[in-house]
Amino acid sequence: MSEPYASSPIFDEQTLPDALRNDHRTKTGTWGLLRVLEGEVRLIFTEPLTEHRVTPDSPAIIPPQATHYVVPVGAMRMQVEFWRERPDPSEGPING
């Protein structure tokens, strides 16, 4: 079983950094897996413009170098895992 090489802290709607609320991207070769532990966030990709609803039952894969940002929908807790290969969201959260 593959594992992430790093994970962000767990953020809530108050502690989510501006860097994640605005356009940003993962580095070359890094996949992100956005896991919502409680509540809901919107994940917006800007190239092309698409929006995904991310919930505890529906994590989201973020491809390498895909420009995106997140928008909390009310109270939430979320974490991002960083992978060297495409993650399998069904493997369950590492932290949380």
Residue ranges and their predicted role:
Residues M1-S2, L16, L43-I44:
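Motif-centric detector for short Cys/His coordination patterns
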Residues E3, S7-T15, V80-G96:
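Double-stranded beta-helix
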Residues H24-T26:
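Short loop/turn motifs at secondary-structure junctions and domain boundaries
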Residues T28-L43:
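Short, conserved beta-strand element in jelly-roll/cupin
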Residues E38-V41, P48-L49, R86:
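Short, charged/polar surface micro-motifs in flexible loops or helix N-caps
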Residues P48-Q65:
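Short acidic-glycine-tyrosine-enriched beta hairpin
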Residues P64-D88:
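Ligand-binding loop in jelly-roll beta-barrel domains
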